[in-house]
């Protein structure tokens, strides 16, 4: 089965073609980072309009890259949520319309299921069951995965997602947008011993997270020490986040008895986190899996892949369509 994937949940326009027998045939991503940089964050209306401008040309380009005509597509997968409503509607409208015109099935894909399954696109994919840490600008959660759709949420953020905390702290340090990668780069220059930030919620049982207090702690430290301390603040902030995520992952693995950990979402590209989780994996005899760096961010390949699995199982979305700003991951049907 050849599935066309469309991702428009936020500020990236991603399109891809996945073949259930041949694998990923083509993948193209357009980033809106420059468009939003002057505003310090994503402007939803601008994001929607840019998706409208870019999506159809990208679809033609990805089909050409795959060596296919639109009639060669067996199904269409589009992100149905969670995300920005206006941005989601662009991808959903185009995806549903194309599927209807071709007489092919369409499926609305959960954005975070796309991230969750993205390591399965790699040459050495994890087997089921596994524990997953999903970390992005909008989500932070620990999940057990017994098979596709069989998800149990072990813990999640009670306030800011980890990617959001990175971006907000980067904005305090005047690092521009997108802030997460800029903060990580600045942290490499920081003194790890100058400041110590608290490790939130490690002093209590459970696997939930809280990151909003770290942003406030960074702001207070900046006010006391001035901008010359920016690199040291970035280092202290990142160390606190990495320690917290690592400890929670270890707890989740010990509680579940699983020996495979998937880490996915935009923040999974953070190299300091990867180094710590690698060390933890060695200590705990746990194999840690990631998507390739290009698939850590939002992309069409993960949507095409996840959609293909559900279409092959006989699932499809009804002829009408709706999108969701919020969509609990553990409400998805098992396949």
From Swiss-Prot:
Give the enzyme's main class according to its UniProt record, as a single word: transferase
- Gene Ontology cellular component terms for the protein in this record: cytoplasm
Q: Which residues bind Fe cation?
A: 111, 115, 298
- Annotated signal sequence range: none
Kindly list the GO molecular function terms attached to this UniProt entry.
iron ion binding; N(6)-L-threonylcarbamoyladenine synthase activity
This enzyme's EC code(s): 2.3.1.234
One GO biological process this protein is involved in is: tRNA threonylcarbamoyladenosine modification
Record bears the keyword Nucleotidyltransferase:
no
The entry's free-text remark on the cofactor is: Binds 1 Fe(2+) ion per subunit.
Please list the reactions this protein catalyses.
L-threonylcarbamoyladenylate + adenosine(37) in tRNA = N(6)-L-threonylcarbamoyladenosine(37) in tRNA + AMP + H(+)
The cellular location(s) given in this protein's UniProt record come to: Cytoplasm
**SUPFAM superfamilies registered for this protein in UniProt:** Actin-like ATPase domain
Q: Which UniProt keywords apply?
A: Acyltransferase, Cytoplasm, Iron, Metal-binding, Transferase, tRNA processing
InterPro entries per the UniProt record, alphabetical? ATPase_NBD, Gcp-like_dom, KAE1/TsaD, Peptidase_M22_CS, TsaD
The protein's matches in CDD domains, at most eight in alphabetical order, are given as: ASKHA_NBD_TsaD_bac (cd24133)
What cofactor is needed? Fe(2+)
Q: Which residues bind substrate?
A: 134-138, 167, 180, 270
Listed Gene3D superfamilies: 3.30.420.40
User: What does it do?
Assistant: Required for the formation of a threonylcarbamoyl group on adenosine at position 37 (t(6)A37) in tRNAs that read codons beginning with adenine. Is involved in the transfer of the threonylcarbamoyl moiety of threonylcarbamoyl-AMP (TC-AMP) to the N6 group of A37, together with TsaE and TsaB. TsaD likely plays a direct catalytic role in this reaction.
Q: Give the UniProt family note.
A: Belongs to the KAE1 / TsaD family.
UniProt protein name = tRNA N6-adenosine threonylcarbamoyltransferase
Origin organism lineage: Bacteria, Pseudomonadati, Pseudomonadota, Gammaproteobacteria, Chromatiales
| Gene (name only) | tsaD
């Amino acid at each position: 089965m050849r599935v066309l994937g469309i991702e428009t949940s936020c500020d990236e326009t991603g399109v891809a073609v996945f073949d259930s027998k041949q694998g990923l045939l083509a993948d193209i991503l357009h980033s809106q980072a420059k468009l939003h940089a002057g505003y310090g964050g994503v402007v939803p209306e601008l994001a929607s309009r840019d998706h409208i401008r870019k999506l159809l040309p990208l679809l033609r380009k990805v089909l050409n890259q795959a060596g296919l005509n639109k009639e060669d597509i067996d199904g269409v997968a589009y992100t149905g949520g969670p995300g920005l409503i206006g941005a989601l509607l662009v991808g959903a409208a185009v995806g549903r319309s194309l599927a209807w015109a071709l007489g092919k099935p369409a499926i609305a894909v959960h954005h975070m299921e796309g991230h969750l399954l993205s390591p399965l696109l790699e040459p050495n994919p994890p087997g089921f069951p596994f524990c997953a840490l999903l970390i992005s600008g909008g989500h932070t959660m620990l999940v057990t995965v017994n098979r596709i759709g069989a998800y149990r949420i072990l813990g999640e953020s009670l306030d800011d997602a980890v990617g959001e905390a990175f971006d907000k702290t980067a904005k305090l340090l005047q690092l521009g947008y997108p802030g997460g990668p800029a903060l990580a780069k600045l942290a490499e220059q920081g003194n790890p011993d100058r400041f110590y930030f608290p490790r939130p919620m490690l002093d209590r049982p459970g696997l939930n997270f809280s990151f909003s207090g770290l942003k406030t702690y960074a702001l207070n430290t900046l006010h006391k020490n001035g901008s010359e301390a920016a690199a040291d603040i970035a280092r202290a902030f990142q160390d606190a986040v990495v320690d917290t995520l690592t400890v929670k992952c270890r707890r989740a693995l010990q509680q579940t008895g699983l020996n495979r950990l998937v880490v996915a979402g935009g923040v999974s590209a953070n190299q300091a986190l990867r180094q710590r989780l690698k060390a933890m994996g060695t200590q705990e005899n746990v194999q840690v899996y990631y998507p390739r760096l290009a698939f850590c961010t939002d992309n069409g390949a993960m949507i095409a892949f996840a959609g293909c699995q559900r279409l092959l199982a006989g699932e499809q979305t009804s002829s009408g369509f709706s999108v969701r700003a919020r969509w609990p991951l553990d409400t998805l049907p098992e396949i």
